[in-house]
């Protein structure tokens, strides 16, 4: 089928939790979904969109997927929280992926990129957390470092190549539609359910509905100011204790203690 090029969007990581919800939101607006491997069709069942193969580690595959695209939702990332060699498997892969992402968008003539960063890329020792606080100064964690430096690199390259870029920084996303493998938020929930994280810990999490984040991505594309970063999060955080209590009420069959 032909799509009007004018409003064609590409969503990378389109089988992931956020990517798939962005695709669903854009389905009436002209969208192409890209995934690293096309084997699993389940996330796209009944959806009227082109599904193409692209990998952030392969720039040419991105250039091909971006032909005729106006807005590029860069959702796909090679994210793990844990790795044998975090510098190589988490940090290097993602920074290389960001370089490929921006350069491919420039070569393909994309107008605007919505870059999905993370709340982990903010300075959260100063409360309340605001975009203007700057970046996280704690350098102990490769996941945080990759998110911080990745977002900075995205803005630097966008400026250098004169392409519009808006960053969104979601907190811990939950909600449907979700397909396996599940994201980091769900891994945390799973660890709690399996009693591998003690519920009495003082850890608080900032939950947000993935559909609200998808909507925030769309607003960043249509109304966001070029060069800005926008936090997409809840106004309040919730202790794990309260999260568990709500889960007990909603899903008594899980027998969460």
Please provide the spans of the model-predicted regions:
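N-terminal Rossmann NAD(P)H-binding glycine-rich loop of SDR-like oxidoreductase domains
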Residues: 7-29
């Amino acid at each position: 089928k032909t799509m009007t090029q004018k409003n064609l969007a590409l969503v990378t990581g389109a089988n992931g939790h956020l990517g798939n919800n962005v695709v669903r939101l854009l389905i009436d607006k002209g969208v192409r979904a890209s995934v690293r491997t096309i084997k699993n069709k389940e996330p796209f069942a009944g959806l009227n969109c082109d599904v193409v193969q692209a990998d952030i580690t392969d720039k040419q595959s991105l250039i091909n997927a971006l032909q005729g695209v106006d807005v590029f939702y860069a959702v796909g990332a090679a994210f793990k929280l844990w790795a044998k060699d975090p510098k190589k498997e988490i940090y290097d892969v993602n920074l290389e992926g960001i370089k490929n992402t921006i350069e491919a968008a420039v070569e393909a003539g994309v107008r605007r990129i919505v870059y999905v960063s993370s709340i982990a890329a903010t300075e959260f020792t100063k409360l309340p957390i605001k975009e203007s606080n700057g970046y996280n100064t704690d350098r102990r964690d490769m996941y945080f470092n990759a998110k911080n430096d990745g977002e900075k690199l995205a803005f630097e390259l966008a400026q250098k190549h004169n392409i519009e870029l808006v960053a969104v920084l979601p907190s811990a996303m939950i909600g449907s539609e979700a397909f396996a493998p599940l994201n980091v938020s769900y891994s945390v929930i799973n660890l709690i359910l399996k009693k591998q994280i003690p519920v009495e810990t003082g850890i608080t999490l900032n939950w947000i509905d993935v559909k609200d984040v998808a909507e925030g991505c769309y607003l960043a594309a249509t109304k966001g100011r070029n060069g800005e970063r926008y936090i997409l999060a809840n106004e309040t955080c919730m202790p794990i204790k309260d999260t568990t209590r709500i889960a007990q009420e909603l899903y008594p069959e899980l027998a969460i203690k």
